[in-house]
Swiss-Prot record:
Belongs to the metallothionein superfamily. Type 2 family. This is Metallothionein 10-III. Cd(2+) 3 binds at residues 26, 30, 32, 42. The keyword Metal-binding applies. Cd(2+) 2 binds at residues 19, 24, 39, 42. Cd(2+) 1 binds at residues 15, 19, 32, 37. Cd(2+) 5 binds at residues 48, 52, 54, 58. Monomer. One of its GO terms (molecular function) is metal ion binding. Cd(2+) 4 binds at residues 46, 58, 64, 72. Keywords: Cadmium, Metal-binding, Metal-thiolate cluster. Induction: By cadmium. Cd(2+) 6 binds at residues 54, 66, 70, 72.
Length: 73
């Protein structure tokens, strides 16, 4: 039985607080929509309003930088 926080073995992307970075292996396919991703390897998704793209260096909501005139969500 795979470890509950091992995303590679369980095929489930764990983004909640139930997992710490310990023993958690998530790949690029694991995308979380909040700053609370506890798995190492999870990609926190940065979203800008409308069709605006996020600028380079955006690693999540706290570092989200959108094009001028766009808001981050």
């Amino acid at each position: 039985m795979p470890a509950p926080c091992n995303c590679i073995e369980s095929n489930v992307c764990i983004c909640g607080t139930g997992c710490s970075g310990e023993g958690c292996r998530c790949g690029d396919a694991c995308k979380c929509s909040g700053a609370d991703c506890k798995c190492s390897g999870c990609k926190v998704v940065c979203k800008c309003s409308g069709s605006c793209a996020c600028e380079a260096g955006c690693t999540g909501p706290s570092t989200c930088r959108c094009a001028p005139g766009c808001s981050c969500k």
